[in-house]
């Protein structure tokens, strides 16, 4: 056996062993960029939905706290920057929800049930009740916050239109109860 063939065989065997070992631990080690391959709703359409969720569900005694499985970050509750107060009125010192907070809330929601979320999105958002957060908000499962939305109302349409890939921003604004702030640009 030539030296080049021996080296190639050893490298190939080592690669196979390494690959098998990586497969064995792949579930316990997150990828370096923490991304997983699932179908998910369009994040660029999420800010109006996030504003509604922050207003309705993101108070510090509900989903605006770190200990919850579904955490909401935004100007009305939990902030990523500890120097930001949970207050949206920019005219009185409040600060709008940041792009990083929209992203954190998006990841929290999409990551709750990634396989189910992928199934709902692949189906064009036709079966939103497969998702626990929709069932709880509709009062179909126990929820400390009670029933929050009714199928077909503006609050429900805000969420389900986003899941279907075409966010109804009018429904989100109506559900919020006041005009939304423009989404701030991401910083450098």
Regions found by a protein language model. Give the residues of each.
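Aromatic- and Gly/Pro-enriched helix-to-coil junctions and flexible linker segments
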Residues: 27-188
């Amino acid at each position: 056996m030539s030296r080049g063939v021996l080296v190639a065989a050893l490298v190939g065997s080592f690669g196979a062993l390494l690959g098998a070992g990586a497969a064995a631990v792949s579930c316990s080690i997150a990828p370096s960029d923490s991304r997983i391959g699932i179908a998910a709703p369009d994040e660029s359409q999420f800010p109006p939905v996030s504003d509604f969720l922050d207003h309705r569900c993101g108070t510090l005694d509900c989903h605006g706290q770190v200990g919850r499985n579904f955490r909401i970050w935004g100007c009305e509750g939990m902030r990523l920057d500890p120097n930001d107060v949970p207050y949206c009125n920019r005219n009185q010192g409040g600060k709008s929800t940041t792009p990083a907070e929209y992203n954190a809330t998006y990841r929290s929601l999409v990551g709750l049930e990634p396989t189910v979320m992928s199934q709902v999105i692949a189906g064009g958002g036709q079966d939103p009740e497969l998702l626990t957060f929709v069932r709880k908000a509709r009062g179909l499962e126990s929820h400390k916050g009670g029933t929050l939305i009714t199928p077909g109302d503006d609050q429900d349409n805000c969420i389900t239109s986003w899941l279907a890939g075409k966010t109804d921003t009018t429904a989100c604004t109506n559900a919020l109860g006041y005009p939304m702030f423009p989404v701030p640009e991401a910083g450098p």
